[in-house]
Amino acid sequence: ETLTKDLSNSGYGSIICNQWHRITASHNTVVIDGMNHTSVEPGIKLSFTNSSCDAKVEHVYEDVGFRRKIQLLSDGFYDEFEVKSGRERNYDFIFHVESDLDMNMDTTFETSKNSSLGYTENGYAYFKDIIKLIPLKGSEELILYWKLGGLKLASSMNIIDTEVFLAKSPANPVTDLRTSIILRRKAKHTTYQMEWKILNV
């Protein structure tokens, strides 16, 4: 089973190819101020082992650098994404999931349905059925439960000073939909932390 993947595209002559598949927001990354990445320069590999990868890149946007570490675990993986900027900006960490939630959202969180992400350009118009999750006051961690084939999964993430959104977005083929997690922060320097675990190993 596939949890997440790079979509490639639906054909270079397709409208959705240029409006979504080749756009920053369709990837598992951080979007700054609703804009596409402005640099396509390669990053720097800091370390690489059989179970981990640590890499960074400077000037993804003007005066913005990324560093990402991924560590495989015996029952899942840990993903850490650090963002640094010279000034306060709006950060959206987006993670697309080829799976469906396996939980009752209305009894677990306060939810605000038909929400807006505030952007319509650079692929944001393709996010549909947007729900804002409002965890209990003072919560520092959010746990979501998923079903992927015969597997039961849990994703946990740090949500201090974070707005949490869930949405549907096009997959490839575009008739399929993915579930997109969007973690929004306003900051100069922040680090996102997400861990995925298989519960029924």
Label each PLM-derived region with a short phrase.
Residues 1-6:
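Catalytic-core region of carbohydrate-active enzymes that cleave or remodel glycosidic bonds
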